[in-house]
Amino acid sequence: MRPRGFVIAARGSSDHAALYAKYLFGRRNRALVALAAPSLFTRYGSPPRLDGQCVIGISQSGASPDVIAVIEEAVRQGAMTVAITNDPDSRLASVAELVVPLHAGPERSVPASKTYTASILALALISQAIDRDDAFGDALASLPSRMGGALGAEADLEELVPVLCGPRAIVLGRGFNFSTAEEVALKLTETSYVLARAWSVADFEHGPIAVVERDFPVLLVGAGGSVQADLESIASRLVDYGCRVIGLFDAPNAPPGLDAAAVHDSALPEELTPLTLAILGQLLAYRVAVARGVDPDQPRALRKITRTW
């Protein structure tokens, strides 16, 4: 039976994958997606009604107690449940009705990298399974070569590094790549100790833009498509303010006036460009961490499995 909508529980990088699903399922499947507030299920003990919903838990380890709690409650309420995890033997997988194993292999770094892109791909495959489309299916089949091709822009990342080596930065995206902006900001923060904050371009203009000043570092992440005009508009405005504006783009070209940009045109539909851009964002965060003298695989104060309730 087709669910009325989706509720997705996740934390950290997995939460950004859930944000991606909000746009993907909304556009391709015309489904309403809600991101769960796990504390309603744990600390407050007042879970919302989940009847008619497909409840998805995303956790690379499958051991996040709050994500598990959401799925357990969904099972109690009789909702359809799905676990997306890199450990098919995990507690999360054992609780859910359906399991989508990522098969990404061991992830040795503390920050999520390949499990993040694998989670995005899993969500895209679920979307395709619900509403099949030949063109989207062909694009999915081409992903290995398209993602490999994105590495051709890796050398261009070096020009972006000096702009991001300060103590703070803003990362902007919109639409499908708002989730990518969130993920890149997290990677810069946790691997490089740069206090990076992500915003949707639209939300940024509703107040946060007041923080910018001359030489303020701003990273734009985008793929053209339906939001191209928004990216070009904010880029022009920030350049006029004297900000140091750089970009990661899966598109034929970058907006004019940027200090530097890494550009790769995968020719993928906009819905799938978060996969190529996530890879470039991870490599950028790695280079910034090395430039700042930080081990990006073992950031201080972090654990591979974070247990929150």
Predicted regions and their residues:
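Glycine-rich phosphate-binding loops that contact phosphosugars or nucleotide phosphates
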Residues: R2-S145, G149, R174, V221-A267, ...
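Hydrophobic membrane-spanning alpha-helices of multi-pass integral membrane proteins
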Residues: F216-G224, L277-A278
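Conserved phosphate/anionic-ligand binding catalytic regions in large, soluble enzymes, centered on
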Residues: A18-A21, A181-E183, K187-E190, A278-L283
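Active-site phosphate/pyrophosphate-binding segments
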Residues: M1-P3, L98-P217, V227, R292-W309
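Peripheral docking tails and interdomain loops at the edges
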Residues: A267-W309
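Composition- and surface-driven signal marking solvent-exposed, interaction-prone regions
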Residues: V184, L231-A235, L277, R300
